[in-house]
Structure formats: C-alpha cells, structure tokens
Amino acid sequence: LTALVLASPGFAGAVELTLEGEAVSRGYGAMSFDIAARCGSPNRMTEPLSLVPWPVEVPEVVDIPPELSLFPLAILLEIIHDDLRLNTTLPTYDPLMLIAIDAIDRADGGEVDLSDASDLVTPAAAWLALTSGGTLTGIAHARGKESDRIAGTIEMLATFGLEAQESPDGMVIEGGQSLHRPIEPIETHMDHRLAMTAMVLASKVGGVIVGAEISEVTHPGFVKQLLALGTNQ
C-alpha cells in the first residue's frame, strides 16, 4: 500500500483498491498517507480506497523521525549487559508501535499482539526468551518480509541456544533462557532485523554473523556504534 501511495503521482488515472483481511502495520500506512499529503497528495485512507494522480509539491523542510522500531534492540542490549545503560528516548509519532513495545515489556508469559509492529518480531522474541517469555501473535504476514521472519527468527535464536516454537500467526517463547555462543556462522538471510538482533546477542557471547552489512539498510553505522559500546565480544 505504501508503494502505491508514493507511486500515485505517476498514475495515468484513478486506481480503485479493494483491501481484504485484517489491517496490519497501520502506523506505517498512516505515515505513508501523511508523507504524501505533506507533498500535495489529496489521497486519504478511505473505504473504498481510490488513489488519484497528483502533482508533487516538495516541502522546504523535511523532518525525518527516528526509527522507533530499533528501540527494542537497545532494551535487549541492557538485558544482556548488566552494566550497560543507554541514553534513549522514545519518539511518539507511532502510538501503535509504542503500545506494542509496552506490551512486550509487560508480557509476563502472556500474549503480545504485534500485528501493527511486525518489525519488532525478532528482537521481541529474543527479549521474551531472556526474560518472562510469552506468545507473539498477529504476525503471519511477517513470513513475507525480507525473509520468512518467523522461521528465520526461530532459526537464528536456536544458534544462540534460545528456543521458540512456530504457531499459525506467530511464535511461542519460553522465558528464563540463557545465551550460548554459536558453534556455526549465523545465517541472517540478508534480513536486516535478523542481522541486528544477531549482532546484539553476539555482543555478549560472540559469534560470526553472515551478512552483517545488511544492517546499514535500517541503521547506517550500526556496527560501529555497537562496537563503540565496548562489549567484550
């Protein structure tokens, strides 16, 4: 949907869309329409949805918000490094993402719906495995991300000795688990979320990450920043 909204200036005419199923990642959808509106788009999220072409008006100032979905990685670093405290602040542009982060923190073995925050799947699974455990739901669509993010997360966690079981729309994670150094190189399937979470875990126990450079897609300089924290591995 985001791609269609941003491509709509080049449409030859109006395009009628029919949306099926339950809405997911609603915060990103709303942001897409907002960005387009700031550039002159008349299109709005309505039902039925019609996207019309429009002339682009480039704003003089473009404010790019911080990547909120990276915050769980900071939490994960603090969980595995007892003496590490990071100076982080949470931007508030996506309330649905904030609700999801809070739900992970409060899981206590319960259910966490990540339907509006599927980018949190991998760090959330590691977070729950090392703390109270829980069940991640609402993320069947994560199988169509840069990788099958459910299967990829389970595979990656297993290399660190962390267990998770796949479910129809997510995964079940037992809490109170412990990290172990991977024996084999860690495959990330060129998925930046898998790579960054794997690097955070490896900062505690070590490991060889395949395709670590893909993290630049989301966070340029991530590897340098992680090394600058002075962790032992």
What are these regions (language model features)?
Residues 1-233:
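Short, structured segments at the rim of ligand-binding sites
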